[in-house]
């Protein structure tokens, strides 16, 4: 009998997703395959739009007739044929932000091992007399324990009883570790006002205005500045008793006074009462300005009940173990088996090995500085993505296609080796890994490279090089080849140490916050400044949680944040954070609407003879509310299918094919540059660069389109939904309104702006920064990308390590100074 040969590659034929040009490509199975290319060249279209889409669709179609019937409405990828594609999983660039009950320990499932350890192997406390009982195998066997002091029997808590999301939750905070309290300083922000002038804010926003009159009846003077009230009067305002008072109510129109009996609500109770009635996020927002969040006073922020904090292993309880960083917890767990009686050691070793096995990959990915009780929502995008990756590796599945979308985001060069090791583990287990990335160190480790291009948008979508790394390096048409083989070079003139502070200083001194120690920082004005350091070294805390709030407070004449001792930044009026969060909450926000182009286009089309004849004004051309929007999808371009037992499936609207407009919109034309007639749906389907030629004569539109082109966004289509943009694209789009203005009073802060950028795109980004600096702006970037760091004027390197081992300025100076600094981990890679 002939043995059929195992396929050795995924065969893609005729792929036309997005801008792909009918491409044919073979992707080796069981290998680490890198996909490179400039932003918008079609990398994600191939990896996610073809390989993942087909792999996941075929897997889902095998589930059941009902599911298959519903899902076949979801379009197949636009491809002639994909052969031998395994079931596929995608690890996306931006994993969702977890909820309030999620911690680093629960996300990584390390808490499961810890809870099991504290249930099975702890010294438990007798609930009758409070004596400690030696560890015993009875717990694992489901038997009771006998107290050596009082002789009574009891059952030890199970692992479930130690979970803060279950039986072990603190009853006061419900296992969240957080309590909301009224912040009295926020109740009267301006004490120079009188109560009649609205000094007590909650009475004006959360309560009837009548409370001012009631306060007067309580003996408080309401016509003198608040800062002149006696201590007794202030106490009545903040904490006075709820007593009824008789007042005379005069309506605003002054007609007819009405006597009323009214109960006095002091300022603090007004907020507490409003908080108790909150039903949704909108309501919470109204109250939140008067609240401060602090650790729960009963559990101290540990989330655990008193009973769940009783069992001890190696002299500490579960809350203390969870407060350790992962690195410290590993050392502690290693010592657990030896601390127990001999008969307990085999079981303890098994539990500890499961913890250490899961922890090893997290350490390889550079996450050893995170504490297990760190709230999941406070992790950065890169940290969440690496947690997701480590979890996948631990599952040890085989025969799966893993598509990783830029896993090197937020990764310090020192952790790239760990990332490659994790991907190699997946391949070693018999899987295929396709990684879309720009980091040349990641791409250089691939078994096979596919490069898309040559440029972005309509000019891309072709395979310009494919083969081993050596073959791609020798390829004439490759655009990544020079970066795979070349030595790095500086693209901007270096500012000398003597000139660095010629345009002034921004100075700040801080106290301890998180892992950042008290420090003083000096930043040169009008320069490109990079803040660097390994993950967890304190970059984000220093810049986003300290510098920006301090600059904003000083500019507004408000009180500095508690942990900032002083700041000296005379002349700085604006501190702008340009981060990578998606623009717009839903698909109704597009590049054209965000960049203020769509309104101008609507007006232009409303001026045409065809529009006038049909009676269409500018409002009719709105795809959100206008008469010409598609009635099937309501102008969103897509519809959602409800699939029972599965998440809803989004498909392109079958009526408008994603254009968002009804057929009638295609009957209104405007003349383009070459005399061709264009409709608004056709324009919205064009890239920025194509639209420049098509909108000659529309001055405002031209200006805005040229700005987008200069920002390196010429390949984006005007109708592209902004939430779908990559982090780097979103950052640059947010800059569109800032370009060209004088900026010497502004500080721009970018959080990892090179996310999603090819080395060639990084050069475009540097020219954007140059444009801002030339206008006098101070540009501060939190960054791991070595090309950008090399081209900065000034570098502040945090560290030396992450977590407790970081939080200091290791060195500051030019990139050459950092490279020469022996204590700097970043410097070694420069």
Language-model features: where?
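Conserved phosphate-binding elements of NTP-dependent enzyme cores
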Residues: 1-830
